Amino acid sequence: MSLGTEEYTWFNILLESMGAKKGAEFMQALAKQDLQMPGSSSVMRVQLMLAGESAIAIAARGRRVTEYKQQGAPIDFRILDPYAGEPNFVALLQRAPHPHSALLFIDWILSEEGQTRLADAAGRIPVRKGIKQKPWVQELFQKDFVFLSPSSIGPNLNSLIEQYNQIFAVRKTK
C-alpha cells in the first residue's frame, strides 16, 4: 500500500469523522501496515501502483484514477466513507495590483464557460451544477463528498502536519 507524504486533507477529514482518539488509533494501525510513502504526488503513486510497486494507493485522486481507467489501464477504485473532496480555491488578495482584472477572472472562472473549460481542459470536477463532465468522471459521483472546512484545518495546520508526520514517520528535509 502507498500513501502520500502530505495527505493532510484526507487525514483531517478522517480524524474529524472518526473522532480524534479513534481516528488517531486507526492511523497508527494503518502506519504499521508496511506502507510505502514515495512522495506527495498522487499521480506518481498511481503510476507506481500501475507499474506493480504497490497494490493499493490510499487517498489517490479519483479523477486521475478514472482517467487511467478510461485509457485502458488495469485499475479500479473504491469510494470509502467518508468520501473526501478537496476543493480548489480562488481568492483575491487584499492589495492586488489589478483587483478589477482579478474580479473579472473570478467571475469568469465561476461562470458556466469557465467551469466548462476547467472540466474539459483540466479534467477538474466543476462546482457549478449543470456542467457537462467527461463521462469517465461520472463514476466519482456515486457518493456525496465531505469537504474539508478551511476553518477546521487552518488554525490547526501545524499540529495536524506534526501529528501526520509523527504517526507515519515522515521525515521532512529543510
Language-model-derived ranges and their functions:
Residues 1-6, 109-132:
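Periplasmic-binding protein-like
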Residues 2-78:
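Ligand-binding pocket segment of bilobal, Venus flytrap-like solute-binding proteins
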Residues 15-16, 87-101, 117-118:
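A bilobed periplasmic-binding-protein/Venus flytrap-type ligand-binding module shared by bacterial periplasmic
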Residues 18, 30-34, 53, 61, ...:
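Sec/Tat-exported extracytoplasmic proteins
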Residues 22-26, 97-109, 117-120:
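Short amphipathic alpha-helical coupling segments at ligand-binding clamshell hinges
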Residues 28, 47, 51, 66, ...:
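Solvent-exposed, polar/charged alpha-helical surfaces in well-ordered, non-transmembrane soluble domains
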Residues 80-85:
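Short, surface-exposed loop/turn microsegments at beta-strand edges and helix-strand junctions
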Residues 135-174:
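Extracellular/periplasmic bilobal clamshell ligand-binding domains
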